[in-house]
Design a protein with these regions (language model features):
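Acidic, divalent-metal-coordinating active-site segment for phosphoryl/phosphodiester hydrolysis
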Residues: 164-179
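Short, acidic loop-to-helix structural element flanking the phosphoryl-transfer center
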Residues: 46-104
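Conserved beta-strand -> loop -> alpha-helix junction used to position metal-binding or nucleic-acid-contacting
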Residues: 29, 132-135, 186, 272-287
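Flexible inter-domain linker/hinge segments
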Residues: 186-235
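Long, contiguous domain-sized segments
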Residues: 216, 220-224, 228-235, 286-299, ...
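Substrate-recognition "cap/lid" segment bordering the active-site pocket of phosphatases
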Residues: 103-105, 109-157
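Short glycine-rich phosphate-binding loop at a beta-alpha junction
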Residues: 103, 107, 248-255, 385-388
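Active-site neighborhood of HAD-like aspartate-dependent phosphohydrolases
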Residues: 2-33
Length: 510
């Protein structure tokens, strides 16, 4: 476990693989008991506890009727799961380069020849010997194997390197040789909810990459490696499952949060034709003000209103939120354009806004025409589409569905999927109706995790951002959010963007 690492977290996880292949869930336990029994019998007969894999499988054959062919399978899996520890290998190469003698030691039941094959397969070719506990009936755990090594090289300074503090360092020093501790690559804190074989493989990948001593990336890159890879892989498989269930002929990945997800999907998981679509809640809701006027008020106007009560006039408010074309109508409705938001009546402003939906619709005509051409071109002849987003309320999915049915064709079947959803009643109903299918969590799926991501009670913006942003910025693009659709002079659809280019571009890139 120092020179070589495994593709699983613990050595006994190899037994779990065998249990699956044998269709015998209790094999892992039986294999451990057989080894313990073999060691006890060896100690009674010969005064030591070092056993070979043949002796372990002799017990398995006698007690559980396990054929010896499974011993060869275990050896084969050990070979297949072993990989080079790049940090130790770099040290090994340097030692060989300066003419040092390298000897490997291990407390192990595998044959010496097998261990030699495993080392050589990982690039270790120029070592002098392997001291294996089952060959000498001695072990590092009590220092006796180290003493045997000292007998071989009595006039040499020996430095022992290992990841077991007690055996590799304390016992080595007690036996008379110098020792260096190389900390175990395995995490001290494990995710117990991944306490299975898939979790073992995942943790091995993370541990063997992050914890050998060669990892030099920052916090954000590390977060992406630990979380982003496995999450994206699982989500892409989920997308294909939902697409198959819904018989989707086209997948639409929503900007900006699905920028990376679409790239990964097309590189490794592509089964359905797909496009990355330019969209935002603001842009798509303003295509259909007759449906989303109240949402527009709550999400974009009143939120800004509350943040700038004593700093913005109504005219400035409408200008900053993109509705400056409504300013001339204010005074006709007893609203002073120069009055600060704190002095204005929200109820009166809401009545004003909702009574001018026809003005909003007229203003959005050119945008609707451009958006109709844009989405119609992407959808083509598809009769069923799946819209993919990251989270949380599914607004882009539902608003785009409404626009498609209203402006393109009511016969197109639209469904959606999210990594995580909110826990609102509306979202729960959409999930129960199988219109939106969440991946990781939602009101009807992994509800404990959903409650963590969407905590009840009043929370600050920062608290919510700390829950949601680490998920979103792993996948998002670096571009500013979309404001509007329009057509160029040559009738090509183009986009108006906000000036809010992300401030954390370096973190996003990491």
């Amino acid at each position: 476990d120092t020179a070589l690492l495994r593709k699983v977290e613990f050595p006994s996880d190899i037994f779990d693989i065998m249990a699956l292949e044998m269709h015998w869930p209790d094999f892992t336990s039986a294999r451990k008991r057989a080894e313990d029994y073999a060691r006890v019998q060896k100690e009674k007969a010969e005064g030591h506890r070092e056993v070979t894999i043949d002796e372990i499988y002799s017990v398995l054959r006698e007690r559980y009727n396990i054929e010896m062919i499974w011993m060869q399978r275990e050896i084969e899996l050990e070979k297949q799961s072993s990989i080079q520890n790049s940090y130790i290998f770099a040290l090994y190469e340097r030692l060989i380069h300066v003419g040092k003698t390298v000897v490997f030691t291990t407390d192990m039941y595998l044959p010496k020849d097998t261990l030699k094959e495993m080392l050589e397969a990982s690039g270790y070719h120029d070592f002098c010997d392997i001291y294996v506990s089952n060959v000498y009936q001695l072990r590092k755990g009590d220092g006796s194997l180290q003493k045997k090594l000292i007998e071989k090289y009595p006039l040499k300074k020996i430095i022992h390197i290992g990841d077991n503090k007690a055996a590799d360092v304390d016992k080595s020093e007690k036996s008379g040789m110098a020792a260096l501790w190389y900390p175990d690559c395995r995490l001290q804190k494990r995710e117990v909810f991944l306490n299975n074989l898939s979790g073992s493989i995942y943790r091995a990948i993370v541990n063997n990459t992050l914890n050998t001593g060669l990892w030099e990336h920052g916090l954000h890159y590390t977060h992406g490696f630990r979380v982003g890879g496995i999450l994206t892989a699982g989500y892409c498989e989920h997308i294909n499952e939902v697409a198959q269930q819904k018989r989707a002929e086209k997948i639409l990945f929503c900007a900006r949060d699905c920028y990376i997800i679409q790239k990964v999907y097309n590189a490794f998981y592509r089964k359905v034709d797909n496009s990355y679509i330019e969209i935002s809640r603001y842009a798509v809701m303003n295509l259909s003000p007759e449906r989303y006027a109240n949402d527009i008020l709550d999400r974009f106007i009143f939120r800004y209103w509350d943040e700038n009560k004593n700093a913005k006039t109504l005219e400035q408010l409408l200008h900053d939120t993109g509705y400056n074309f409504l300013v001339p109508y204010l005074e006709d409705n007893d609203l002073d354009r120069f009055i600060y938001c704190s002095s204005a009546s929200k109820e009166l402003f809401e009545e004003f806004f909702l009574s001018h939906i026809d003005v909003l619709k007229e203003h959005s005509k050119a945008s609707r025409e451009a958006a109709t051409a844009y989405f119609g071109g992407l959808i083509g002849t598809s009769k069923s589409i799946l819209i993919v987003d990251v989270g949380w309320s599914g607004t882009c999915i539902s608003a785009l569905e409404y626009f498609i049915h209203d402006a393109i064709s009511p016969d197109i079947h639209v469904s959606g999927t999210l990594i995580c959803s909110s826990n609102t009643k509306n979202m729960c109903n959409q999930i129960l109706g199988k219109y939106i299918v969440p991946y990781v969590c939602g009101p009807c799926r992994n509800n404990d995790f959903n409650n963590f991501m969407m905590p009840s009670g009043k929370k600050s913006v920062r608290e919510i951002d700390m829950l949601h942003m680490p998920l979103e910025y792993m996948f998002t693009s670096e571009t500013a959010s979309l404001v509007d659709y329009f057509k160029d002079n040559d009738a090509t659809v183009d986009f108006v963007r906000d000036v809010n280019t992300p401030k954390n571009i370096n973190e996003i890139r990491e």
